[in-house]
Amino acid sequence: MSNMTQLTEAQIIAIIKDWNFAWSLIFLLITIVLQYGYPSRSMTVYVFKMFVLWLLWPSSMALSIFSAVYPIDLASQIISGIVAAVSAMMWISYFVQSIRLFMRTGSWWSFNPETNCLLNVPFGGTTVVRPLVEDSTSVTAVVTNGHLKMAGMHFGACDYDRLPNEVTVAKPNVLIALKMVKRQSYGTNSGVAIYHRYKAGNYRSPPITADIELALLRA
């Protein structure tokens, strides 16, 4: 029976040839996502990266459950069951924290699997929300020719003289307020401002109005 199912060298080479091109494209895609999937580089690639990360939990659970139902041996069945349980608990924890953050900010960025920090910047009659990958006690705002970048991310058109005096960083369990402590202009409608943490509390951020998040996605 084993001789009938044993693959020959030619069959193995044929299988590798069939999958080689597909795997080369998959690894190229993974490389692009890992290298350029940052909000400061390309928001479009970053959103795709978040989608891929979001699929890892259910994929891990599905594979673990399949391995537990159709095990190789008893040891693999036990390990697969443990992995499935851990993946399920991590996924549930993620949803709990994301829902808490969504209730605090009202932004769909709350379901970002990479970070649970959201930077809320009020300007232009709205509040623009962006994921904050690095948790810090201070945030730098740079306005160049009327275009705002904070923490390396694009926020759109904004006059330097109309920069908000306060921004907030939302987490599932706390809202941190940062006040402008220093600013310096260096050209026409251009300058730098530094925001530093000065208080924190368990309350909601100001309501978001017409935050065209998806329309502001930019490379």
UniProtKB/Swiss-Prot annotation:
HAMAP family membership = BETA_CORONA_M
Q: Where in the cell is it found?
A: Virion membrane; Host Golgi apparatus membrane
Q: Which PROSITE patterns has this protein been placed in?
A: COV_M
For this record, the Gene Ontology CC terms, alphabetical, are:
host cell Golgi apparatus; host cell Golgi membrane; membrane; viral envelope; virion membrane
Grouped into one coarse class, the protein's main location is: virion
- Give the GO molecular function terms: structural constituent of virion
| Membrane topology value | Multi-pass membrane protein
Descriptive protein name: Membrane protein
Which proteins does it associate with, and in what oligomeric form?
A: Homomultimer. Interacts with envelope E protein in the budding compartment of the host cell, which is located between endoplasmic reticulum and the Golgi complex. Forms a complex with HE and S proteins. Interacts with nucleocapsid N protein. This interaction probably participates in RNA packaging into the virus.
Q: What does this protein do?
A: Component of the viral envelope that plays a central role in virus morphogenesis and assembly via its interactions with other viral proteins.
Q: Name one GO biological process term.
A: symbiont-mediated suppression of host type I interferon-mediated signaling pathway
Q: What is the lineage of its organism?
A: Viruses, Riboviria, Orthornavirae, Pisuviricota, Pisoniviricetes
Q: Which family does it belong to?
A: Belongs to the betacoronaviruses M protein family.
Task: Pull the Intravirion topological domain ranges from the record.
Answer: 40-49, 100-219
